[in-house]
Amino acid sequence: MQINREAILADWEAHPMRKPRIAKVTINIGVGESGERLTKAETMLEQLVGQKPIRRRAKQTNRDFGIRRGEPIAVKVTLRGEKAYQMLDRLLEAVDRKLKASNFDEHGNFCFGIQEHINIPGVEYDPEIGIFGMDVCVTLERPGFRVAKRKRQRRKIPTKHKLTKEEGIVFAMEELKAKVEGL
């Protein structure tokens, strides 16, 4: 994949409304079972982020895993604004600021996994809680995306204003100081 980094940066410099920003950071811990482990994951996530997570329920029954439909099996938390930038900085340190090009989707959003939460700077191991892995998803947007989300006079985002995979990669490299492998 060839990225014209200078052209993208020049476009953002000339048109500030085209420069992407982080819309939200979603942290998900899929425990796979309800009960004590789910409660521990919820406690750990609340301590890590400082915000109460919500429980996610199973969409369908899976007898092989012993999961019933509607049973809580995961916890997630969504961060927005300055809190999202600060938390993402800590989460990227846990993976040594390395991302793969395959982590990015066609709209510039990216996700990465953290194997053990104790790799995050400032987190101590607690034997009562244990160790959990997590998925981190970062959603990017441009100024003006509210047009598609508002209640009145909702409009579609024009194709030329939508983010591309290349712009998402350049944003991660420039703003978040991440190294993207596999280009």
Curated annotation (Swiss-Prot):
Keywords tagged on the record: Ribonucleoprotein, Ribosomal protein, RNA-binding, rRNA-binding, tRNA-binding
Gene Ontology BP terms: translation
Keyword set includes Acetylation: no
SUPFAM superfamilies membership: RL5-like (SSF55282)
Annotated Gene Ontology cellular component terms: cytosolic large ribosomal subunit
InterPro entries linked: Ribosomal_uL5, Ribosomal_uL5_arc, Ribosomal_uL5_C, Ribosomal_uL5_dom_sf, Ribosomal_uL5_N
Gene Ontology MF annotations: RNA binding; rRNA binding; structural constituent of ribosome; tRNA binding
Similarity section: Belongs to the universal ribosomal protein uL5 family.
Subunit details: Part of the 50S ribosomal subunit; contacts the 5S rRNA and probably tRNA. Forms a bridge to the 30S subunit in the 70S ribosome.
Functional note: This is one of the proteins that bind and probably mediate the attachment of the 5S RNA into the large ribosomal subunit, where it forms part of the central protuberance. In the 70S ribosome it contacts protein S13 of the 30S subunit (bridge B1b), connecting the 2 subunits; this bridge is implicated in subunit movement. May contact the P site tRNA; the 5S rRNA and some of its associated proteins might help stabilize positioning of ribosome-bound tRNAs.
Protein name: Large ribosomal subunit protein uL5
